[in-house]
Amino acid sequence: MSMSDHEFRPLPHAPNTTKVVEVLQTQEIIYDSKNSEIDINKKEKKEILEPKEEKPLRSSIFGATFMLTNICLGTTIFTFAVKAKSFGLVWLIVCCCIVAIVNYWTITRGVIASSKCDDCDDFSEITEKIMGKKMRVVLNMFLILYSYACIMCFLALIFPLFGRFIQSAFYKDKYPTYDDFADAKWGKAYIKFPFFIGLTFLLCLLCLIKDINKLNFSAYIGVGAVIYTLFVVMIQCHSYYKYYKKNVYIKEDKSTHPNWTNMKDAWKSDLDFFKGMANLFTAYACHPGIFPVYAGFKRNYSKQEGVKKMKLSTLFATILTTALHIVSIVCSFLTDPYTPEDLVIYRKSKDNGKDVFMVIARCFISLSLFFTLPGYYFPLRLSIANVFTHGKISKSFNIIFTFVTCYVCAAIASVYDKILNYLSYIGGFISVFICYLIPVLLYLNSKNEKLTKWNNLLELAAVGVLIIIGITGGIVTIIDDVKN
């Protein structure tokens, strides 16, 4: 999620958010000591940002590719193994590639629309200029929902992930599995709720930081955590697969066989196909982050050349992101084809031994999630300001809103911790509108053509199919929650 345009940068995955702000030199949150308000519309920079010159940096294809790739990468990359069991490994990879193509198509539509707004660099302003204030309000409402959902999802993930780190690092002999540890200690109210209260208090302090550039280090933690964990999964998947073949696989029992190409399970009563597609929509959600990245090209190149370079960067980023997703899908699936965990970093170690490298990964990911959370809160607050307070928030309101928001999200996360369901809700009810519908509508409206032309109707029909798939995934998830 990009904080540079006062919106958000999706995830799940905000490790480089503050870096985008620093590189593109866009406006920041300014505390006005005279009227004790935060004015998000001020253009000048204060001492906390220490500006030296107002020269926009010249974007490169390599830099833009890296930034777009990093926007898409996050902990969702480790959630695909469980879907491979129902989809079939091959078909899940096919679906991933299809979503990647959709991702490239809709991003380029947003870029073309943005190229026609010379004085606008952020999602909200572009939306208002092309489609009016009402659509900007609609967009900001979706951004608010997105930020809330991501904060709750990450808080819900931190608790069991950190618990697995504690269990595997210090209690492995006494409690061989996390379930044993959770039943005996970690899941007890006297541990769980103080943990959430303390964690949320620290989060509130981070969210009240005036200069978000001070959180730049979270970018390196986030990128390092994902790369390290992916590397561990890649290196170890062979030994885990050999263990599975030796101890679990039974030639006569097909239920123990890996599911390579059978997609029937995804279409059974729980309709896991739609939930899996909604998860993929979330994994590729990066569209609001493209506008500040494209701004670097727009400032320094002609319109045609800037669009061409951004399209090329998007293509490279999509290919790289998809390659990393496929590697994660294959390696995570091979780690445990029979009973995969919701996240591969939840996996049980072989022979109940101590997997030191995965223990480190769990600690690393937990830290990255915590320091990434402000990247979802800042755009939430700014979207609230855009919609309800004309871009200004008093200091007292800021403090109260921060604590209330964080603790409400933590309270929900403490009782509802189904990570894959969070991703289905985000992808099914929010991402399809923010990442698919609105960019395509911006493009079609910027063309000054009738929407009834056959090629425009074809694009709208394609988006409609994606929305139906996403919403169905969200509805199926609700039904599962009600049943369970």
Region spans (language model):
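Central hydrophobic cores of alpha-helical transmembrane segments in multi-pass inner-membrane proteins
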Residues: 75, 100-109, 199-208
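Alpha-helical transmembrane segments and their membrane-interface exit regions
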Residues: 98-106, 226, 431-438
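Membrane-interface "cap" regions at the ends of multi-pass membrane proteins
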Residues: 2-79, 103-108
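Membrane-water interface regions at transmembrane-helix termini and the short interhelical loops
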Residues: 81-87, 200-222, 411-422
